[in-house]
Amino acid sequence: MNMDFNLFMNDIVRQARQEITAAGYTELKTAEEVDEALTKKGTTLVMVNSVCGCAGGIARPAAYHSVHYDKRPDQLVTVFAGQDKEATARARDYFEGYPPSSPSFAILKDGKIMKMVERHEIEGHEPMAVVAKLQEAFEEYCEEV
């Protein structure tokens, strides 16, 4: 049974990774990759991915749909909570003033946290409500593409 569960979870993780990278997000798997990405000039949207139901049913669809907008971040990146622990911990160091939360979204500008959309703003909400929250932040912090 343990072997079956591990295979099942590996499949879930693989699918979760594929969904977010297919949406145009770059996976960051090490602390060094996080530092390189999050210290770049411009705006960055970080999606903290997760295997929970609200990640698959709400956060990842919102991550995909939110960026189809006139104003959007310069780069889209993702870390995977519970999987890429070093990268996730390092990304959370940039989210000053916010407790760890997954799934979640962070908008950074020139390496500084501007806005978080935390799990409590995702779980129990419709994907389009999360899209609206993200696009509201894009209006405030991002340039027109």
Swiss-Prot record:
Keywords noted in UniProt: Disulfide bond, Oxidoreductase, Redox-active center
Expression induction: Expression is up-regulated by cumene hydroperoxide (CHP).
Keyword Transmembrane helix among record annotations: no
KW Ligase (keyword) present: no
GO annotation terms (biological process): cell redox homeostasis; response to hydroperoxide; response to oxidative stress
InterPro entries from the UniProt entry: BrxB/BrxA
Subunit structure: Interacts with BrxC.
Protein name: Bacilliredoxin BrxB
Species per Swiss-Prot/TrEMBL record: Bacillus subtilis (strain 168)
